[in-house]
Structure formats: structure tokens, C-alpha cells
């Protein structure tokens, strides 16, 4: 429950319970940032009945899931929730993201990659906030306006990034590939991403050269 955060967009669990809901179901992963699990909260009487249901044995989580969920909840309880990657990504301030995008662009330039920092909207996605967007910044390739062949080249670059090592999930907008820095855990991933962009561009350049006509009959 992130009061004052730009990520807040719907009633929180505590608000739903306070409003009189007998049971509220929510995910242990997604916005909470813990392991994949389902959590039921609400009136003690109802939760007690659910604990006695025959299906509980089949649906109860294993010890590893419980341990990791407990660790995540303890971070929130103790005020260390900034250590939860999902929380950090969703609550990052635009100024921090702009600085991160600038650093990535500089690393790209040093690696010979022509990129440009652009403002964008990051989609939260998932079942929790499928339509919610947050202001963000991204590095766009190629820099400047896309040419008439931009869409085809962007698709090749996006595919090369997905199949690279490490794999990078980018998106295409207006004929250019965008790498949204809100999706990064922290700045330590920037050098790795810049290198992945360089490798993907070189891979696409090789494909373009191989496909180009030689001029020989």
C-alpha cells in the first residue's frame, strides 16, 4: 500500500477490508513483489472456515513460498521496502529515471551506439493494473526520426535483443526500439544493457549486409 505514490490507482487491501469485505484475495507477487502466491485476508470467522476446507491441503503453499513471502512482508514491516525490486521500479521518481537514461545513453555512445533519451509512459500491466501507466524515460534506437525502413529495422533489432545474451525485452514505438529504464532494478544493470544493445545492433548490421544485393550478375 503505497500512499502518496504515483503507482496508487485502486483501493488497497486494508481499505477493502475496512469497507466491509468479508474476504479480499490478492497476489503475493505482482505489486507486492514477493513469491507467486495467493493471499486471503478478511474477517477471522470467514478465514477460519476457509482453513478447514478440504481444498486447503491441495492449495496450501510450500515452505519455500512461505519463507520468501515472510521475508518480503518483513521488509515492508521494518521500513525496508525499497529493497523490493518491484516496489523500487514502480515508485522511482522521474528525475531519477531521467538521470539513469542519460547514463545509459552515455554508455551507449561510448560503445559506438547512436541512441537518444526520450520521455515515455511505462505500463504497469498484469492483472493488478492492466491499463495504468507511469511517466518514465527510455533510450531510443536509432536516434532521431525513424526512416521509411524504420519499422523493419526496429523489428529486427527488437528480435535480436530478445534472443541475445542476456535477453532484453524492449518495445517498438514509431519505428524505433525503446528500452525503458523504469524496468531496470538499479544503475548497476546499465553497462550490461549498453553492451547488449551494441551486440544486437552488430547482429542486425550483419543481417543487413548479408541481405544487401552484391551488384554482380
Positions of PLM-derived features:
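Conserved PLP-enzyme active-site core in the AAT-like
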Residues: 1-75, 196
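Conserved PLP-binding catalytic core of the aspartate aminotransferase-like
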Residues: 88-102, 109-157
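Short amphipathic beta-strand starts and helix->beta connectors
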Residues: 22, 121-126, 161-168
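PLP-dependent enzyme catalytic core of the Aspartate aminotransferase-like
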Residues: 78, 143-217
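Short Gly/Ser/Thr- and Asp/Glu-enriched loop/turn motifs at secondary-structure junctions
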Residues: 32-35, 134, 171-177
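Short acidic (Asp/Glu) and glycine-rich catalytic loops that position anionic groups and cofactors
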Residues: 44-51, 77-86, 131-136, 174-175
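Flexible, glycine/charged-enriched surface loops at secondary-structure junctions
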Residues: 27-28, 59-63, 79-85, 112-118, ...
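C-terminal catalytic subdomain
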Residues: 60-107
Amino acid at each position: 500500500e503505497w500512499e502518496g505514490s504515483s503507482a496508487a490507482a485502486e483501493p488497497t487491501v486494508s481499505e477493502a477490508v475496512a469497507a466491509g469485505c468479508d474476504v479480499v484475495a490478492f497476489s503475493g507477487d505482482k505489486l507486492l513483489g514477493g513469491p507467486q502466491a495467493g493471499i486471503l485476508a478478511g474477517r477471522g470467522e470467514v478465514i477460519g472456515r476457509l482453513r478447514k476446507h478440504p481444498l486447503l491441503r491441495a492449495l496450501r503453499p510450500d515452505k519455500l513460498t512461505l519463507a520468501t513471502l515472510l521475508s518480503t512482508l518483513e521488509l515492508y514491516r521494518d521500513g525496508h521496502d525499497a529493497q523490493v525490486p518491484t516496489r523500487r521500479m514502480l515508485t522511482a521518481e522521474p528525475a531519477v529515471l531521467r538521470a539513469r537514461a542519460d547514463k545509459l545513453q552515455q554508455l551507449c555512445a561510448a560503445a559506438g551506439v547512436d541512441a537518444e533519451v526520450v520521455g515515455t509512459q511505462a505500463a504497469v500491466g498484469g492483472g493488478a493494473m492492466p491499463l495504468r501507466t507511469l511517466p518514465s524515460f527510455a533510450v531510443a534506437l536509432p536516434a532521431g526520426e525513424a526512416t521509411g525502413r524504420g519499422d523493419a529495422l526496429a523489428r529486427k533489432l527488437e528480435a535480436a535483443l530478445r534472443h541475445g545474451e542476456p535477453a532484453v525485452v524492449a518495445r517498438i514505438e514509431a519505428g524505433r526500439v525503446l528500452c525503458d529504464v523504469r524496468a531496470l532494478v538499479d544503475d548497476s544493470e546499465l553497462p550490461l544493457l549498453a553492451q547488449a544493445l551494441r551486440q544486437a545492433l552488430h547482429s542486425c548490421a550483419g543481417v543487413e549486409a548479408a541481405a544487401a544485393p552484391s551488384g554482380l550478375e
